From Swiss-Prot:
Disulphide bridges: none
Protein name: Argininosuccinate lyase
Lineage: Bacteria, Bacillati, Cyanobacteriota, Cyanophyceae, Synechococcales
GO biological process: arginine biosynthetic process via ornithine; L-arginine biosynthetic process
EC number per UniProt: 4.3.2.1
Length: 466
């Protein structure tokens, strides 16, 4: 569908109007309208600075600021709904301001280009979204921490290669995801420091001849510093790439946990039970309860990866300074933000009220395997037997047990002592699952005291940053 072309600020340079199909092709208003609140805020700061610097009169500055506030109100109430002929959010706002104020509205763009304008808008937007996502990460961590604190002494099989390896405290397993989320929170905090740099005043690429005060607009908008180079200011998309990379890692961590929930909820595992609040059924199989939430989180992860790769490809061959290619930086960014926010919310709800762990099933799983085999080798090594010799002996024992349909706990003391004279009656205590977990009390290990201390540290961090 095409739309009739309307005059643009640059129309006097051209003899004929833009082709209607190219109007649609060029337009970004369909998605960059998401920046309108930030565009209005940035424009108000710019107008205030222009008036303070006597580039426009005080009365004109006040009229522009008030006009922009009226546009904000009109947008929020649905009265201002620009079409594709506006091309982008910046022209849409300027056109409406001119309708309201006449020639005074045309003065807003003095000493400014859309190039530094869009950079400012995007940073203001992303700064807010980063703050929101960091708060979401804290909410997610609180829910995981609550689950971990409830299951400090609940055991779960630990896996390598998706094969039973060693038993763990369930709290220790969840703590691993708490630490991943902490790195995500810190990573976004680091990004925010670099994000908080103002490009406003850089102009199209070379600065401006007007006596503007870039530090003033930066202060009005809450930026901590300004770009030192005007070319860099309008060309830089590092912060968007950094955000998409950080968002990708958040999604990696959510997706890994989602995958585990999917496995745990299966009949083959039955480690968790999904509540009706966070599961759906089948249109044909009445017995089904499907883990849609973690499956969607797992599926949505790829789209965030794609947005990161797409932006890197857009940027890799661009000469300085602004190029129309950079219009392609926004749709992926907006979608990645929405995806991360929705997935964090969904996973928080899932762990708050959407699943329950099944301690009896978990305990039975831990009891019915050879994940205590390493502890038999450690038992002998602690009594002077070289570890590799002990390791090989236990490997033979496991093979024999498998052939006979036994577990290690089923061997009699006589059978143990026939294997090696160092075995005594306390071998049964050493290989009991609770003791196996408790004994791994090295710093950062799954031992109950270590996990209790680790969770206390997490709670302290969360309370300090609430």
């Amino acid at each position: 569908m095409t739309q009739a072309a309307a005059p643009q600020p640059w129309s006097d340079r051209f003899e004929t109007a833009l082709h209607p199909a190219i109007v649609v092709f060029n337009a970004s208003i369909g998605f960059d309208l998401a920046l309108i609140e930030y565009d209005l805020t940035g424009s108000q700061a710019h107008a205030q600075m222009l008036a303070e610097q006597d580039i426009i009169s005080r009365e004109e500055g006040e009229a522009i600021v008030a006009g922009l506030e009226q546009i904000r109100s009109e947008y929020r109430t649905g009265q201002f709904q620009p079409g594709l002929d506006a091309e982008d959010v910046h022209f849409a706002v300027e056109r409406r301001l001119t309708e309201l104020l006449g020639d005074v509205g045309k003065k807003l763009h003095t000493a400014r280009s859309r190039n530094d304008q869009v950079g400012t808008d995007t940073r203001l937007y992303l700064r807010d979204r980063v703050d929101h996502i960091r708060q979401q990460l804290r909410d997610y961590q609180r829910v995981l921490l609550s689950q971990a604190e409830q299951h400090l002494e609940t055991l779960i099989p630990g896996y390598t290669h998706l094969q039973r390896a060693q038993p763990l405290s369930l709290a220790h397993h969840l703590h691993a995801y708490l630490e991943m989320a902490e790195r995500d929170w810190e990573r976004l905090g680091d990004l925010r420091k670099r994000l908080n740099t103002s490009p406003l005043g850089a102009g199209a690429l070379a600065g401006t001849t007007f006596p503007i005060d870039r530090q003033r607009t930066a202060a009005l908008l809450g930026f901590e510093r300004i770009y030192a180079n005007s070319l860099d200011a309008v060309s830089d998309r590092d912060s968007l790439v950094e955000f998409l990379a950080a968002a990708s890692l958040i999604m990696v961590h959510l997706s890994r946990l989602a995958e585990e929930v999917i496995l745990w909820a299966s009949e083959e595992f039955r480690f968790v039970r999904l509540s009706d609040r966070c599961a759906t059924g089948s249109s044909i199989m009445p017995q089904k309860k499907n883990p849609d939430v973690p499956e969607l989180v797992r599926g949505k992860t790829g789209r965030v990866f794609g947005h990161l790769q797409a932006l890197l490809v857009v940027l890799k061959g661009l000469p300085l300074a602004y190029n129309k290619d950079l219009q392609e930086d926004k749709e992926g960014l907006f979608d990645a933000v929405q995806t991360v926010e929705s997935c964090l919310e969904a996973m928080t709800i899932l762990f708050a009220e959407g699943l329950s762990f099944q301690p009896d099933r978990l305990a039975a799983a831990v009891e019915a395997d050879f994940s205590n085999a390493t502890d038999v080798a450690d038992y002998l090594a602690a009594r002077g037997v070289p570890f590799r010799e002990a390791y090989n002996l236990v490997g033979r024992v496991v093979r024999t047990c498998l052939e006979q349909g036994k577990l290690l706990k089923d061997l009699s003391l006589a059978e143990w002592q026939a294997l090696h004279p160092q075995f005594e009656a306390d071998i049964y205590t050493a290989i009991a699952p609770q003791q196996v977990v408790a004994a791994r009390n090295s710093l950062g290990g799954t031992g109950f005291e270590q996990v209790r201390s680790a969770l206390a540290s997490v709670r302290q961090r969360l309370e300090a940053t609430c």
